[in-house]
Amino acid sequence: GIFDTESAVKACDGNRKGRIMEEKRKNTMILYRNLRYQQLFDDMCSLLKPEEGEARPDAYACASQIIDLAVTYGFRGNLWHCFLAFCMANNENAYSTSCEIIGPVGGSLSELARHDFAQVRELFSLDIACLDETENGIWSEMKHYENALENSKAFNHRIRDRIVELSVSLEHAESDQEFQDIVTEFYKEFGVGKFGLNKAFHIIMDEEAKQVDIEPITRVEHIELSDLVGYELQKAKLIENTEAFIEGRAANNCLLFGDSGTGKSSSIKAILNQYYDRGLRMIEVYKHQFRGLSDVLEQIKDRNSKFIIYMDDLS
């Protein structure tokens, strides 16, 4: 065959142009980078805001991933907006973690965050129905999604409700500043990332990598203290100590003991359920995981929540 130098140069230029565009798209965000579902985010941006010379992602694959997330987390309504709100709620960065601790922040960090929020707000304004090849297609359906598993215990309804409420509020933000204020208030009230959205955790230790990961327990049995009958003195002691702890006053470590089935674990869950909204979180650590405790403390030391380390079966 004949090697066409001119065509080869054009092809290289085209590939280089595509790479530059792809790089530019990925780097337009300053703080909100490395999103939990970054590839899906990028692909949706490419579908909704196509650029010349850019390869078109598989729209059906994107729809499938968003629907999978909706089933996993129980999302309803406009799934595109829910996905964007989920990205905002989960991304731990300099701005979001600062807001979790002190609330609204000013100065350059706030200005940099507004740069990102302006772009996300623009994404909220884009109509996913434009992706439909036919009238009343899959994307139109995803704008008014009804969750078939509404009464299911397969997902955490509290987390779902917060994400859906955030998405609706952001949809109606009339300015970049209002958009930023809504997200900032969310961070201050609930926190950000896994510690903001979840109440209970366990640890996973990677012996080879010498790494300790704190993973959410997504479904915690909703037991209330009023469900525990006949333990009024014990409940009073737990309540008094827990309230002192979350208020920053002196508190003690607690040892719960008794026969199997007497309510020890139920008491722990009930305390967690009652005080979660006031910032209480709980991390379950087993006896064989004690050597990873220092790594756990290192990961939670700068968060705005109050953490109880729950050690089960100390025998």
What are these regions (language model features)?
Residues 270:
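Active-site signature of alpha/beta-hydrolase-fold catalytic machinery across serine-
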